[in-house]
Amino acid sequence: MHQYHDLLERILSDGAEKHDRTGTGTLSVFGHQMRFNLGAGFPLVTTKRLPLKAIVHELLWFLRGDTNIKYLHDHGVTIWDEWADANGDLGPVYGYQWRSWPTPDGGHIDQIANVIDMIKRNPDSRRLIVTAWNPADVEKMALPPCHCLFQFYVVNGKLSCQLYQRSADVFLGVPFNIASYALLTMMVAQVTGLKPGEFVHSFGDVHLYSNHVEQARLQLTRAPRSLPTMTLNPDVKDIFAFRYEDFALAGYDPHPHIKAEVAV
């Protein structure tokens, strides 16, 4: 995972001091790209321990089209608690836009089902896109989408995915995002009869919060270890049929967790 360490180092050396919505302060760079060959191992950061359960359940929650944290709580995941209202609702966030994008005539578009169908029918299409950035709904969301658009690409029987992330908390959020979209790429590849190719992660404002600087410096003193492998249950052929038990991670030997506070 040298790609991630290179990004941390770039921000620490070249980042501009910027004010931000949370009032915490950041070091920020604009425009960066990382590439991960999914055939070389599952890109789960090894220089600190990450909670795979939370990553998997959050992705399954998105794919359900869910926007209430009850499902997450039922599975011991609390990463969205700070933004939910008293009823656990978040407004029309990721899951809603992915699965039920509203149309002017009162209908809804299931972008996930549509893109999978298009990959099967026309894999050379340049329109294999899902977006969560809906300007009409942004003000209704508890948190506007940070990872806001992704595109699939098929060549030589392999499926690749590129994510555009407008805003990225490099210490806490980005390791989650890498693993989540790598896993989504593997899932979509399986249900479309393809092999996983690359995950390409492109950023707009990628930043290190001022209260994460020492943690990032600590992480950079640790040597990355071999990537683990992720295996999916080969019997699952429907993207919406995956369950937590269908994922098996092997060979994950990370350095210890590094505690840091989330900026809300």
Curated annotation (Swiss-Prot):
Subunit structure: Homodimer.
A single cellular component GO annotation: cytosol
Family: Belongs to the thymidylate synthase family. Bacterial-type ThyA subfamily.
Biological source species: Bradyrhizobium sp. (strain BTAi1 / ATCC BAA-1182)
Binding site for dUMP: R21, R126, R127, R166, S167, A168, D169, N177, H207, L208, Y209
Protein's name in the database: Thymidylate synthase
Domain of life of the source: Bacteria
Organism lineage string: Bacteria, Pseudomonadati, Pseudomonadota, Alphaproteobacteria, Hyphomicrobiales
Residue sites binding (6R)-5,10-methylene-5,6,7,8-tetrahydrofolate per the record: D169, A263
